[in-house]
Amino acid sequence: MSDNLSASQEKTPHERMQARLTVAALVQWQGRFLVVEEEIKGQRRFNQPAGHVEAGEDLLTAACRELKEETGLTATPTSWLGTYLYKPADSEATYVRTAIIFDLEKAPGQHHPEDPDGDILACHWLTLEEIAECKPALRSPLVWQCIEDYLAGTRLPLSALKAFIQS
């Protein structure tokens, strides 16, 4: 350490966060929310249909793909709910999750997930109360936060999501 710098002023290298870019689909139908039941590290977890953005995808395309893969549903994205940063205490990973609100054009039927990752156990339409009962088994606090934001009326325009993907 230089004689001119105190211990609190000593320059230290900044560690850069390595974020994992993910999307989630929030779908509500007649007072029930669509959740997927997954197996993560041998434990049952509940989540919105969600996953990683793949190379070359924009956020809306990724959210539509994840919804289709995990539930078999095709729906219309209507609003951007928000973007959330999550750093679990038990992991080195940091997640940046963009949540998109989808509207169903007709009543949901049977779910036939494509599930290329093989971790979806089932799809459920749960009330807020049922999700609250599952809180300890939610995949992350983002699941509940997205529902709270949705119920609070948060709606951002999809046109605010910009993508500049160069090949």
Predicted regions and their residues:
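Unchanged
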Residues: 53-76, 86-139
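Acidic, metal-coordinating catalytic segment for phosphate/diphosphate chemistry
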Residues: 1-24
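Nudix hydrolase/Nudix homology domain
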Residues: 43-46, 117-167
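Short connector loops at helix/strand junctions that flank enzyme active sites
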Residues: 20, 28, 48, 75, ...
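Conserved Nudix-box catalytic region and its N-terminal flanking loop in Nudix hydrolases
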Residues: 29-69
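Conserved beta-strand and immediately adjacent loop positions that scaffold enzyme active sites
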Residues: 24, 32, 122
